[in-house]
Regions:
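Beta-strand/loop substructures that line and gate deep hydrophobic ligand-binding cavities in soluble
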Residues: 67-124
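Short solvent-exposed loop/turn micro-motifs enriched in small/polar/acidic residues
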Residues: 13-14, 39, 78-80
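Structural motif
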Residues: 4, 27-28, 52-54, 84, ...
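Hydrophobic ligand-binding cavity/cleft-lining segments
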Residues: 1-16, 132
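Glycine-rich portal/gate segments that line the openings of hydrophobic small-molecule binding cavities
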Residues: 16-70
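Short, highly charged C-terminal tails/helix-capping segments
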Residues: 18, 134-141
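Short, flexible helix/strand-to-coil boundary loops that buttress conserved ligand/catalytic motifs
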Residues: 8-9, 59-61, 130, 137
Length: 141
């Protein structure tokens, strides 16, 4: 299961290794991402989980010791993001995935501007992850 997530959740042209995973309200995960000559760490703090329909978590970049840091290529990137993933049935064979991703906490104007400017890249990242998931599901009986 962890290997599956590592391979499917990493964005295109990146690899991910989950160092720690405790997916439950109040739990957290800590991951190492490498790709395109960049190495970074991130942490997710799980706030709400409604199986199998919804998960809400905050996300932040960290150093290897889990101390909050900034995105290595975007020093004005918001310190913390709030992510909500909702799964809704679409007929009997499909599921609609809705992602709501926003700045969380005390966000400075320049951080919000960096977030808005990067929207296209974020869409590409989420799409790459879902493309990997779709490939996996097509291979699975």
């Amino acid at each position: 299961y962890p290997d599956y997530l590592d391979k499917r959740l990493a964005t295109t042209r990146r690899t991910m290794q989950c160092i720690k995973r405790d997916v439950r309200p109040g739990g957290s995960s800590f991951s190492h991402l490498v790709g395109n000559g960049i190495e970074m760490y991130s942490r997710a703090n799980y706030l709400e989980i409604e199986k199998p329909h919804r998960i809400v978590y905050t996300q932040e970049f960290c150093d290897k010791d889990e101390k909050i840091s900034r995105h290595p290529l975007a020093p004005t990137w918001p310190e913390r993001m709030l992510t909500e993933v909702t799964l809704s049935p679409e007929g009997t064979e499909q599921t609609r995935v809705t992602i709501k991703w926003e700045c969380h906490g005390d966000t400075k104007p320049e951080e919000l501007a960096a977030f808005v400017k990067a929207r296209g890249g974020m869409t590409q990242g989420w799409t790459g992850s879902f493309d990997k998931l779709e490939e996996y599901l097509a291979e699975t009986p």
